[in-house]
Amino acid sequence: MAYRLLRALFRGLFRVTIDGITDQFSHQKLIITPNHVSFLDGALLALFLPIKPVFAVYSNITESWYMRWLKPYVDFVALDPTKPMAIKHLVRMVEQGRPVVIFPEGRITVTGSLMKIYDGAAFVAAKSGAAVVPIRLEGPEFTRFGRLGDVLKVRWFPKISIHVLPATTLPMPQAPRARDRRVLAGERLHAIMMAARMAIVPRETLFEALLSAQTRYGRFKPCIEDISFKEDSYQTLLKKILGVSRILQRFTAQGEHVGMLLPNATITAAAIFGATLRGRIPALLNYTSGAKGLKSAITAASLKTIITSRQFLEKGKLTHLPEQVTEANWVYLEDLKDTVTLADKLWILFHLCCPRRAMVPQQADDSALILFTSGSEGNPKGVVHSHASLLANVEQIRTIADFTPRDRFMSSLPLFHAFGLTVGLFTPLMTGSRVFLYPSPLHYRVVPELVYDRNCTVLFGTSTFLGNYARFAHPYDFARLRYVVAGAEKLADSTKQIWQDKFGIRILEGYGVTECAPVVAINVPMAAKVNTVGRILPGMESRVIPVPGIEQGGRLQLRGPNIMRGYLRVEKPGVLEQPSAENTQGEQEAGWYDTGDIVAIDEQGFCTIRGRMKRFAKLAGEMVSLESVEQLVLRISPEGQHAAATKTDSAKGEALVLFTTDSEITREKLVKAARESGVPELAVPRDIRVVKALPLLGSGKPDFVTLSKMAEDPEMSA
């Protein structure tokens, strides 16, 4: 009777729903592993699960007064961390057929993300051979019984959902020592818990996800700021989004690809969301690619209109672009301000109250925006992402990293770059964090000062940018940073060292590609390994295809919810080329994406990037990574700029060419360094050419197309 009354009370107050139940609880041996978000979690499971489980609870909690009061109604077993026999007792209970609930995190979350997973629960599952049923609780964290009251909009009676995920097994890992087996089992359970979180992510559009974040964190929560130093809340950002969307629909059509040539600023964020909510697909143009790059983008994406700002063009010394690029109609934001009518203002006011009614009908799998590859190995390609693929990458990041509304991001990487867009705009907005948008990562003195002034806690950048920030920063500028992540290029040892020595900060290295929205793998404090780029994100499948001549690693192929919809190529304007990759049998498989990167994945799942497939040279039948050549040169000249390329050689097929800004580099020095580090002499270039500066793309990466031409034509290097 008491159970029925309490169940009815909870269902009435919290509108509790439970989904996913079929035969998940019919297994003979069963362990239930829920996430832990509030003090209500145990009561919810006791009341709404269709079975009567035993709860594993720490002994210090079982001795409290309220647990003694609950003892006649709820079965629980006390766990004493100091007594190993408690785990064995739990294993026996599972083997006897008693379903057991274990909270693997061991404590209520204080971040909203998964906390540390204790391997005891995993060991019980592996030792007993029980089925593991993960459960996701959504909603209790908003109550006053959670521990997120300082970061979430707490409500008395929020809606609560209990999601029951399919049962899985956790076999005992193979390892020589018992401790290693426990650790590996714990990592496997952590992967199961992360997969459970990804499985219940709602399918939304970008605009719907922003509205969900506004509901979750509060409409007046500050969220975005730029160099005007006027911080906007979700409400004021929404007002700008609605205003831009209203104006955009006058000169663009639904489904049209709309070019945007804009800096890192709040108005750019408003333009991106404003375009998508009215069914337009923004194409974010690289303003450093020059007229030729813009023309390629216009052709590939079939752009008719480019939205920009006169002030931006003047400050960026880009006023020549509209004159040189006449293939599209240029629209200036400054000209649009005076076109706002009373009807527009009333429309905006109405939809501030009911913003979802401003959306045109869309699905999560519809195209959301277009990014462009760097063009480092050929013509830039348009990469079309759906709402679902972009938001999946945000959720993958949220699953492994504990970003909260207490954080503040410094976003200086350009938004036309996938790295800057996802981690510098979408991630902070969807996690309730505040973000400061700065228009250039090249201002090496200004960025550290702003990190200090705005109390930023999260900084993403390339190795080059982070190294330069460290050189110009005061030792106290980065005192508040707790996440510093490097991506887009290999993290240099010198950059790692200066950050550790000067600031006491460990840089976490990650790896991504535009086609994956872009993050593929990343080191985080909970799972990091030196000289790797971290583990593949949850929700993604990976496979390593062997490559003849390469012993360690192979070509990385990926499949998952964050993979692009397809390419738009200059050669086939407006035609979407869906991703596919060749498997080990030589067959093309749809849905897989071939990164073109040579990767090794160790037994713990950590990835090491060996280099680009296209950046391997075949010298006398041996495969040599051009990136390994560059790393060798960096050991003896860490301050210089170096890039390796190949040229045709009649004797060996190919020969190495080293371009460097250091005139002191000689083959003798390189041979000595190679012997000391165990690098074969075959990887030491004979052709060394000194240049004033390497040809670079707008993203800061070396222009390998130009370098290849320079390698074949010595006069170009002169």
Curated annotation (Swiss-Prot):
Q: Which reaction does it catalyse?
A: a 2-acyl-sn-glycero-3-phosphoethanolamine + a fatty acyl-[ACP] = a 1,2-diacyl-sn-glycero-3-phosphoethanolamine + holo-[ACP]; a long-chain fatty acid + holo-[ACP] + ATP = a long-chain fatty acyl-[ACP] + AMP + diphosphate
Annotated region AMP-binding: the residues are 233-646
- TM segments? 258-277, 409-433
Q: Name the catalytic site residues.
A: 36
Sorted alphabetically, which Gene3D superfamilies does this protein's record hold? 3.30.300.30, N-terminal domain of ligase-like (3.40.50.12780)
GO cellular component assignments: plasma membrane
Q: What is its main location?
A: membrane
> Sorted alphabetically, which keywords does the UniProt record give?
Acyltransferase, ATP-binding, Cell inner membrane, Cell membrane, Ligase, Membrane, Multifunctional enzyme, Nucleotide-binding, Transferase, Transmembrane, Transmembrane helix
What EC designation does it have?
Answer: 2.3.1.40, 6.2.1.20
Cell compartments where the protein resides: Cell inner membrane
PROSITE patterns, alphabetically? Answer: AMP_BINDING
Q: How does it sit in the membrane?
A: Multi-pass membrane protein
Task: Cite the residue spans of the region called Acyltransferase.
Answer: 15-138
Please list the GO terms describing molecular function.
Answer: acyl-[acyl-carrier-protein]-phospholipid O-acyltransferase activity; ATP binding; long-chain fatty acid [acyl-carrier-protein] ligase activity; medium-chain fatty acid-CoA ligase activity
One GO BP annotation is: fatty acid metabolic process
Fetch the PANTHER family from UniProt: ACYL-COA SYNTHETASE, MEDIUM-CHAIN ACYL-COA LIGASE ACSF2, MITOCHONDRIAL
Q: Which family does it belong to?
A: In the N-terminal section; belongs to the 2-acyl-GPE acetyltransferase family. In the C-terminal section; belongs to the ATP-dependent AMP-binding enzyme family.
Q: What does the UniProt function comment say about this protein?
A: Plays a role in lysophospholipid acylation. Transfers fatty acids to the 1-position via an enzyme-bound acyl-ACP intermediate in the presence of ATP and magnesium. Its physiological function is to regenerate phosphatidylethanolamine from 2-acyl-glycero-3-phosphoethanolamine (2-acyl-GPE) formed by transacylation reactions or degradation by phospholipase A1.
Q: Which HAMAP family match?
A: Aas (MF_01162)
Listed name of the protein: Bifunctional protein Aas
Origin organism is Yersinia enterocolitica serotype O:8 / biotype 1B (strain NCTC 13174 / 8081)
What gene, per UniProt, encodes this protein? aas
